[in-house]
Structures are given as structure tokens and as C-alpha cells.
Amino acid sequence: MGFNEQHAIKHVVIDEAQDYSLVQYQIASNVFKSAKITLLGDLNQSIMPFVNYTSYEPIIKMFLRDRARDKEETQYLTKTYRSTVEINNFARKLMVNQAYYREQVERHGDQVEIIQDHETGEKSKMVQDAVEFKKRFGTVAIIYKTKKECKELQKALAKTKYAKDFLYMIDGECNFSTDKVMVMPLYTAKGLEFDAVLVAGCNEDNYNSETKKLFYVACTRAMNHLSLYYDDIPSSLVL
């Protein structure tokens, strides 16, 4: 396979480094052979099923080999500033790789809420809570695991009094609002942060030991308040 090397580019920054395969990194290494490489990532936030690193060593060794070097500079950002102590303590239990636990800033807030909600549409407690949170917080998001679930909520609220209160980021829209509750699937929420987050569908069949990293990503979008909603059997991860 041939590659057009990009010698004009001197430095490449790769964000979300935990989500790229070694094949993709090999291509990047070949294309940007003369460039310096900076990797930014969190191994606990890997959501790609074909990638499961336990460390960055395989990636680093490949870049060093291709550049005929024997050492790299690694800096670990060991303090997290995003979330409150209460949210961070909850999220820590979800971390697959505890070796990468980060020190947290001592900023306290609400306890994490775990709520059973059998209702749907405008009768849903989650929907009512989200509207109330908008009066208290700047940015509020409802995070579903899938796009299908987001569309179901959109349809359920379309002709209700709450229709104007919600903004949907489902099919790649780049809308972002501080005036409305944002509704999005987990893969869209990745990399974003909100004052208050409501995670929907926290049932055992949605979030379990096999999908712990996905749940970790959803929960760590919250800065000040985190509410978790389930309708039947709660995920063992929330207990």
C-alpha cells in the first residue's frame, strides 16, 4: 500500500487517542513520517468495539520504531477539573483501568440520583426533571445509548407542551443550546460537557459489565449534577 507523505506538516495532534486502531496509527505514522506526534486520550473512554488498549505502549513503540528513536516524552494529566467530587466518586467505580485514576479538584455538589421512571413522553419524570433543571443549570442534556431512543422521545414530545423545550442532536447536527434541553445519543455526547446530565435507560440490558466504558463516558459528561433513570431492572453498575 502506498502513502503520500506530508512533509510540510511538522506536528500532528491526535485527540481521543484511545479510539484508533494500530492499523490507523500505522497509516498516520507513514503519512506524517517527519512530523512530531502528540497523543491525547483517556483509556477509560474507549467506545470503539474493535479497540481495547490497556496502555499506550503499543502505539508509542510503533511511532518510535518508524522514526528510529528510542524514547518519548509522556506526560500524564493527573487532575480532573470537570466534575464534582460526588460525580467523580461515582464514575471511579466504573473505570475499567484504575491505574489511570485522576486526582480530583475538591468541588462538591449534588449527590448522584438513581431514579425509577416507568412513564414515557410528557409524563416521564426524566422529562419533567430536565425541564426543571433548565431553571437551575446553564446546560442540560439527556443522553440515550442509541439514536433510536432519541427519536422515540422526539416523537413522543412532538405535540406536547414540552416540544419547545428540547433540542435534538441525532443525525450529526451541530446545534448547541443553553436555552433548551439537549437530547443526544452517547456517541454524539462524547467529548462534550454539561452542567446537568440525565442518563436514560440505565437498565441492566443497556449498561452492564460489557458496556461499562460506555456508561462511564455518559456519566462523566456531567459537571455539576448527574441523574440516572431506569424503568425496570436497574443496571448493576448503579447499585
Q: Model-flagged regions — what are they?
A:
Residues 3-7, 11, 18-239:
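Conserved helicase motor core of SF1/SF2 NTP-dependent helicases
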